[in-house]
Regions:
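N-terminal Rossmann NAD(P)H-binding glycine-rich loop of SDR-like oxidoreductase domains
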Residues: 2-23
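Residues at the starts of beta-strands that form the adenosine-phosphate
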Residues: 2, 26-28, 104-105, 140
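Short, polar loop motifs at secondary-structure junctions
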Residues: 30-38
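Conserved Rossmann-fold NAD(P)-dependent oxidoreductase catalytic core, especially the SDR/UDP-sugar
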Residues: 33, 80, 85-128, 135, ...
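NAD(P)H-binding glycine-rich loop region in Rossmannoid oxidoreductase-like domains
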Residues: 3-4, 45-100, 197
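Short, conserved active-site loop motifs that form the nucleotide-linked donor/cofactor pocket
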Residues: 43-45, 141
Length: 223
């Protein structure tokens, strides 16, 4: 596998980068980002680009799998148009350019409840992204749909941290069909994405509880 990764400067993307570089079936990882990715692994090649401008990175799209780990929050990006550009336009632009360059597989982080018809701005943007990338016609196309993501972020997000703490308190009560809404850790998402790239899955859209199962399988394979 030759991987292309966008979003490597984020929490989940950074973990996925390390997993990809450590795996014997991955011959190389190319990261495309606005900021420099601090990783000197011999299998890693990083490029600082404008992800909304294909001319700045199309020549670097040489690989088999595209991993999309980009995203933002409404707290960080209050402007709705800019928010939509990051959640929808950016991943779609990169995916379309990657397909034109011969990349056959895409695995993108979306969100649980993503739908073009959602009344929530976040889920609607992710739903539009899923719909439009799926329509491009990749040979393999997967959207991972995590619930609320845990982990420790470098930037301060007090409101998000509050909701994570509340969610952790009620997680044990979420059983049955509610189990998929439990918090999921970024390393779990990253491990599941690696497993999907290596083995595929029966569904295009993979919800949070299934991601935990796939991550466990990937960890078992590493033993």
């Amino acid at each position: 596998m030759q991987a292309i990764l966008i979003g490597a400067t984020g929490l989940t993307g950074g973990i996925l980068l390390e997993l990809l570089l450590a795996h014997e079936q991955v011959v190389g990882v190319i990261t495309l980002s606005r900021k420099r990715v601090q990783n000197k692994h011999p299998k890693h090649t990083g490029h600082e680009v404008d992800l909304l401008d294909p001319a700045s990175y199309s020549e670097h799209l040489k690989g088999t799998h595209l991993f999309i780990c980009t995203g933002t929050t409404q707290a960080k990006t209050a402007d709705k148009q800019e928010y939509y550009r990051i959640e929808h336009d950016l991943p779609l632009t990169v995916a379309q350019t990657a397909l034109e360059k011969g990349i056959g597989a895409v695995i993108a982080i979306s969100a649980l409840g993503a739908s073009p018809d959602s009344s929530f701005v976040y889920n609607r943007g992710k739903g539009d992204m899923e719909r439009d990338i799926a329509a491009l016609g990749f040979k393999q196309c997967y959207f991972v749909q995590p619930a609320l993501i845990g982990g420790n972020r470098s930037e301060s997000r007090p409101v998000e941290r509050f909701f994570i703490n509340v969610q952790r308190a009620i997680d044990p009560l979420m059983v049955g069909f509610l189990k998929k809404y439990r918090i999921i850790e970024p390393d779990t998402i990253a491990a599941a994405m690696l497993y999907i790239a290596l083995h595929g899955d029966k569904d295009m859209r993979i919800e949070s509880d299934r991601l935990k199962e796939l991550a466990a399988l990937q960890e078992k394979n590493n033993l």
